[in-house]
């Protein structure tokens, strides 16, 4: 299984595409497609048919569409900048992620 340096509930910034510069929270990671869903970013309108069995009304809904993982960067809470993420081990042997700009632990 692929290892992404981006995890669910991380704050990320879009660095390429039509939503460049927007910041949002990661909702879901689609590892087999190298894509992630980011809250209120890359929103598209979808036409939905009514489904009486699920009590779902029809109409036009706005839905987040997946972004490629290479088009986003993690935003560090300490320095509030988009940054690369590295891994290191703490004294007790636990593997943690850290910000490569300010050296603070992200997890």
Swiss-Prot record:
Q: SUPFAM superfamilies annotated for this entry?
A: Translation proteins SH3-like domain
**Per the record, a Pfam family?**
KOW
Alphabetical keyword list: Ribonucleoprotein, Ribosomal protein, RNA-binding, rRNA-binding
PROSITE patterns reported in the protein's UniProt record = RIBOSOMAL_L24 (PS01108)
Record the organism: Nitratidesulfovibrio vulgaris (strain ATCC 29579 / DSM 644 / CCUG 34227 / NCIMB 8303 / VKM B-1760 / Hildenborough)
InterPro entries documented for this protein? KOW, Rib_uL2_dom2, Ribosomal_uL24, Ribosomal_uL24_CS, Ribosomal_uL24_KOW, Translation_prot_SH3-like_sf
Q: Name one GO molecular function term.
A: structural constituent of ribosome
Q: Note the subunit structure.
A: Part of the 50S ribosomal subunit.
Tell me the protein's name.
Large ribosomal subunit protein uL24
Q: Which GO terms describe its cellular component?
A: ribonucleoprotein complex; ribosome
Cysteine disulfide links: none
What is the recorded function of this protein according to its Swiss-Prot or TrEMBL entry?
A: One of two assembly initiator proteins, it binds directly to the 5'-end of the 23S rRNA, where it nucleates assembly of the 50S subunit. One of the proteins that surrounds the polypeptide exit tunnel on the outside of the subunit.
Q: Which family does it belong to?
A: Belongs to the universal ribosomal protein uL24 family.
**Where does the source fall among the domains of life?**
Bacteria
A biological-process GO annotation: translation
